[in-house]
Amino acid sequence: MAASFFSDFGLMWYLEELKKEEFRKFKEHLKQMTLQLELKQIPWTEVKKASREELANLLIKHYEEQQAWNITLRIFQKMDRKDLCMKVMRERTGYTKTYQAHAKQKFSRLWSSKSVTEIHLYFEEEVKQEECDHLDRLFAPKEAGKQPRTVIIQGPQGIGKTTLLMKLMMAWSDNKIFRDRFLYTFYFCCRELRELPPTSLADLISREWPDPAAPITEIVSQPERLLFVIDSFEELQGGLNEPDSDLCGDLMEKRPVQVLLSSLLRKKMLPEASLLIAIKPVCPKELRDQVTISEIYQPRGFNESDRLVYFCCFFKDPKRAMEAFNLVRESEQLFSICQIPLLCWILCTSLKQEMQKGKDLALTCQSTTSVYSSFVFNLFTPEGAEGPTPQTQHQLKALCSLAAEGMWTDTFEFCEDDLRRNGVVDADIPALLGTKILLKYGERESSYVFLHVCIQEFCAALFYLLKSHLDHPHPAVRCVQELLVANFEKARRAHWIFLGCFLTGLLNKKEQEKLDAFFGFQLSQEIKQQIHQCLKSLGERGNPQGQVDSLAIFYCLFEMQDPAFVKQAVNLLQEANFHIIDNVDLVVSAYCLKYCSSLRKLCFSVQNVFKKEDEHSSTSDYSLICWHHICSVLTTSGHLRELQVQDSTLSESTFVTWCNQLRHPSCRLQKLGINNVSFSGQSVLLFEVLFYQPDLKYLSFTLTKLSRDDIRSLCDALNYPAGNVKELALVNCHLSPIDCEVLAGLLTNNKKLTYLNVSCNQLDTGVPLLCEALCSPDTVLVYLMLAFCHLSEQCCEYISEMLLRNKSVRYLDLSANVLKDEGLKTLCEALKHPDCCLDSLCLVKCFITAAGCEDLASALISNQNLKILQIGCNEIGDVGVQLLCRALTHTDCRLEILGLEECGLTSTCCKDLASVLTCSKTLQQLNLTLNTLDHTGVVVLCEALRHPECALQVLGLRKTDFDEETQALLTAEEERNPNLTITDDCDTITRVEI
């Protein structure tokens, strides 16, 4: 950019463009802006009388040229003089054009440089138009005042994240994207940056600039028009863990790279700048917690046509290409793997190796393990030889040892000491690099990685077929059973993708033959026994918290392709819980479930698999067969008693298949839950299941839209004489007041229904109909849930009348309704009556105040049936609790459970609560979580807990809300009293039976 552009003459020229009134407003804005920016003030008297030329001189005199221009540009923006802003931009683009030319040259060179796989040679370096449009949309300002965007590109290794970023940089340098959005776009690779000594952001920018002296001041003058592209974020060790006090806001200050990038991401430095961050699938918790993420974009890799193009380019011979492609296309799993370009290269390389040896490709395509074993064993078999040499055998064994260590220590980059410890000598390294299975990594000469994490996983699995974990030089390497448990439990080792599958896949008969041929031995029988024992333990332990990922188990068993063992293994499981999100999941689940005969509980979801059917599309025959295998477990597993289907979309044909299995005489379900399920077809088919299922006792619909006709059909089915449903939940099902008429008929006519939950539906004016039905002496309902049903205080009159006349309802939940003190007063009139039989009342978040507690206190004394009272999330405060405590200490009060969470309580009320603890003979559970109690209040409560007459068994407090002294006090009290539990999760504690 020409130096004269920053002169006072250039500034004067722009000021001349302002009309008289605009020039006056410019001066007013100047006064305000310099105050906001805390800049040295130009005397207002001088500004006020200055001409355009004089004001330009004043600006240059009091502020440096660059700063003067930045202030002027900001004022132009405030005045909405976009034309002047654009003129400035055009004149400033000298630097931008210089940098764009450099970026284009740099990234074109990187694109053309030789890679291991050379995948890029088969595809154009230019970004497709649809990709350009999508990238532009990602960074389009969404709201005024919220310009900066932080976008995450998330995907597995090899999916093409770095490729996309390189294409983005080239497209930006050609003005194909972000043309009016970003003046400068800088690419930082964390893998390279982590090797740098402490540096500054200015230095990092200068590294990317074509000349030694980058115009930093100019570059950052409009930070809202800066984009920082950060690749391989997971390589940033210790990133985002720094306390706020360690962050840096100075562009010129030298700090460790992770601190600089953390300062950028957490908006301490250049908060107006936008960020594009590429990361592997497991998004670190600190990134989610510390960074405001605008959007997450997941690259799709190769689509089907890309895969076909790649096969044709790779094999050269069209006939061979189509032979390989068609075989892979027949396997959902292999075809899915080809979505990731690097894995597609591995698969094609493996097939090409087998072709050249005249092998049957169908055998190689039997499983993922077969592809990888062929790939790896061929790399370690010298060209023209029948088998490996002792040296290549040793090299592969050493590599397997290294891989196992890496998987257990979460290490994916290795130094030479790591290699030596596992038996890789220096002389082996060139040969291993020559196989391409091991690569040099980053800038350091002595740093190595496996070609892909899946190759590392395969080698780690292979280790267990060659040696015992006890023979490994690193103590972190554990036994097979621990590996399997870690693989099957959702919360552990989330980054293990294929490790368990490769381990079981290597037990396949054909794979054992390969192992015998290559190594002369293998340990398959011992491992099979360990897998059996592991699944037996999991089956006996159960899965109460949903910790075990049944799909992970299914994938491992599917990979074995051993029906006899699979049948034996799946029947060790009593529960299955899994999510089907693609066709591969569907195939794998179907394969295993068709052998199940011992399941007691099944919970699953199906998403993105079954599309809506019409004359143009239908569910494929193969998908329907797989779906039938999944549904058939309802009839083949004689012990299955509970089915939960959630977060699912079913097409008409799959819905019909499911309903047919549900109504089969061999289906003996007792509990059926349908949560957030949408289905095409006649819903009456589902309700008619009740005609055929006399064992069904519990039926639940949640977040599933039911029409008026649906409700009518459902209630007709529930009234079927042979039906035995006792519990019905229709939560958040879009019910309306009109539906209450049909439900009222159900309550009147059905003599088996004891539980009804219609929470989260807008029922309001329909509640009187329900209450009228419940006034009938013939109703048998015990539990009634009306939480968040948009009830008002007027509804309380009908509910009160019902409580007086009904002799069966024991549990009533009216939470999350605007009842207020007036509604509570009406309810309490009924509660005080001797004819009221209610045992449990939930009034959480009902907008009750301390004033309402007086009526509630009176009811507690009068009603000796009431055992449970939940009034959390109401601002009753210390005054309200004081009123309740007077009732709780009364000899006629029989309350056993009291919920006072988040009621605005302080330690002031602890003395009153303490008196309840020492006087009440019945109170067993008291929830005080989410209140602002301090140490003094807790001391008072603990003194009461030590009283010999105290009957409390559960005290609801979150220990971590208190200081160390108070936490120690609460822990000591728990240890002193073995019958006392102090927890912040009172819902998990067993309730008193009604």
UniProtKB/Swiss-Prot annotation:
Q: What is this protein called?
A: NACHT, LRR and PYD domains-containing protein 4
- The residues that the entry says bind ATP are 155-162
Tell what the record comments on domains: The pyrin domain is sufficient for suppression of NF-kappaB activity, it adopts a typical death domain fold, but in contrast to several NLRP family pyrin domains it doesn't bind homotypically to the ASC adapter, which supports the observation that NLRP4 has no effect on IL1B activation.
Q: Where in the numbering of this chain does the NACHT domain appear?
A: 149-472
Q: Which GO terms describe its biological process?
A: inflammatory response; negative regulation of innate immune response; regulation of inflammatory response
Task: Provide the leader sequence positions.
Answer: none
Task: Spell out the SMART domains in the cross-references.
Answer: LRR_RI, PYRIN
User: Can you list the GO cellular component terms from the UniProt entry?
Assistant: cytoplasm; cytosol
Domain of life, per UniProt, equals Eukaryota
Check the record and name the SUPFAM superfamilies matching this protein.
DEATH domain, P-loop containing nucleoside triphosphate hydrolases, RNI-like
Q: Read off the InterPro entries from this record.
A: DAPIN (IPR004020), DEATH-like_dom_sf (IPR011029), Leu-rich_rpt (IPR001611), LRR_dom_sf (IPR032675), NACHT_NTPase (IPR007111), NLRP_HD2 (IPR041267), NLRP_innate_immun_reg (IPR050637), NOD1/2_WH (IPR041075)
Q: Spell out the PANTHER family in the cross-references.
A: NACHT, LRR AND PYD DOMAINS-CONTAINING PROTEIN 12 (PTHR45690), NACHT, LRR AND PYD DOMAINS-CONTAINING PROTEIN 4 (PTHR45690:SF6)
Q: Where are the LRR repeats?
A: 637-660, 698-721, 722-745, 750-777, 806-833, 863-886, 920-943, 949-972
Does the keyword ATP-binding feature in the UniProt annotation?
A: yes
How is this protein organized at the quaternary level?
A: Interacts with CHUK/IKKA, inhibiting its kinase activity.
Q: Where is the Pyrin domain?
A: 1-94
The family note in this entry says:
Belongs to the NLRP family.
Protein purpose: May be involved in inflammation and recognition of cytosolic pathogen-associated molecular patterns (PAMPs) not intercepted by membrane-bound receptors. Acts as a negative regulator of the type I interferon signaling pathway by serving as an adapter to promote DTX4-mediated ubiquitination of activated TBK1, and its subsequent degradation. Suppresses NF-kappaB induction by the cytokines TNFA and IL1B, suggesting that it operates at a point of convergence in these two cytokine signaling pathways.
Q: Keyword ATP-binding: yes or no?
A: yes
Task: Please give one Gene Ontology molecular function term for this protein.
Answer: molecular adaptor activity
